[in-house]
Amino acid sequence: MDRVRARDRRLAGVALALLIVLLAQGVSADRASASTDLRRRSYMLSLTNDDRAQHDKAVLRLNAVLSRYATHHSRQMATKGYLFHTADLNSKLKGLDWSIGGENVGVGSTLDSLEGAFMRSTPHRRNILRTGFDHAAVGVIRSNGSFWVTVIFYG
């Protein structure tokens, strides 16, 4: 009987240790994913700002709070499997100092190719290079090998 209890305690200890390891890995994965999302967001904004600099436009400053919405929007598009614009962009910009807003959404195999496609599209290019814009919110999600991007511009 004592051997059975000792064995049960050892098994419970092993199970607890395994659970702790699995939970720690989940937390690490979440942190790594968040870190990767931030790097992708920063990279996409740098591509946009590089294009603006080549056309003597001011650098866009990132709105991190609005970027959470942009990320949510990108995730929705990836989940649904198609592109769509924010239904009411004005409501998302409420409370910000703005008079003009715009949005680019896209999906592509790389962020570089996606920025290139934006620059070849007249309405997207207009948003990227618009003088009145001074802020941007960026959301990037990778799903099934593709990058789903939402960039909200305002100024």
Question: Where are each of the predicted segments found?
Answer:
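Bacterial N-terminal signal peptides
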Residues: 14-25
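Loop/turn elements at helix/coil->beta-strand transitions in domains of secreted/extracellular proteins
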Residues: 53-55, 100-101, 134, 146-148
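Short, surface-exposed glycine/acidic/tryptophan-bearing loops
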Residues: 67-115, 128
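A short alpha-helix/helix-coil micro-patch that ends at or immediately precedes a cysteine
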Residues: 30-78
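Surface-exposed patches in mature extracellular/periplasmic domains of secreted proteins
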Residues: 54-68, 81-92, 125-141
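Bacterial N-terminal signal peptides that target proteins for export
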Residues: 3-15
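Disulfide-stabilized extracellular recognition modules
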Residues: 107-155
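A generic alpha-helix surface/boundary motif
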Residues: 46-50, 87, 99, 119
